[in-house]
Amino acid sequence: MAPGSVSSVSSSSFPSRDTSPSGSCGLPGADKPGPSCRRIQAGQRNPTMLHMVLEALKAREARQGTSVVAIKVYIQHKYPTVDTTRFKYLLKQALETGVRRGLLTRPAHSKAKGATGSFKLVPKPKTKKACAPKAGRGAAGAKETGSKKSGLLKKDQVGKATMEKGQKRRAYPCKAATLEMAPKKAKAKPKEVRKAPLKQDKAAGAPLTANGGQKVKRSGSRQEANAHGKTKGEKSKPLASKVQNSVASLAKRKMADMAHTVTVVQGAETVQETKVPTPSQDIGHKVQPIPRVRKAKTPENTQA
């Protein structure tokens, strides 16, 4: 086939392109000049009516609220493409839903109902920001120095940094804990005092007193008694001789007292004689009897 025939077939097989003006859409009556079909189909979407009402209240925020008329004027001025036929109904529904959800309120002492009166936004509750824990000055300084000199630290500096971290992580004991532990250590268990068995004084035989089994103090202590006993034994020997001498002197005195004078008349002369009685048994010294000695009899024959 000739090359010319191919071109003729291809041109006849495919339909010719539409040479209609840009404004036409292939619909009847589309030849009229006007906006393109794409613009009409896509359109400009408006936000919801509730969103527009909230935006109007934020823009015209007042202390006593914003009236419904002011809300309408704001929406129509900013969104001119809103459907005017349904605008009143949509606005009433948006105000009711906003009040039901707690987004809108009426000002105090307001008696209006429906899509009348004025509205205002509900104030949001103020939330207190949680205070972040303040980092210590030493920790912040250590972080800054560590970030700056991380690549330039030597072995000695690395060792120091690890020591600093260990010291910071160390938990220091609280003062209250130390104060509470101190009296516990100071307290010591009292030693059990064993009561000594009660003993009576054998020498005196006196009963014990009520105060802890202590004996009643006497005039002479045991030490004095012991000292007296020692001195008594030492002085007993010279005293024995003195006692004997005193007994002898007493015997002589008694003998002298018992002696009486007897007057004897001998002629013209009178003689006084003193008779001394023999010592009796009640005198201190007893008279020992003289032993009798038998005389040996000699026979007469022997004498001769």
From Swiss-Prot:
Domain H15: 45-123
Compositionally biased region (Low complexity): 1-24, 132-144
A Pfam family reported for this protein in Swiss-Prot or TrEMBL: Linker_histone
Domain of life: Eukaryota
PROSITE patterns documented for this protein: H15 (PS51504)
Stretches for region Disordered: 1-38, 110-248, 270-304
Family per similarity comment: Belongs to the histone H1/H5 family.
Record protein name field: Histone H1.8
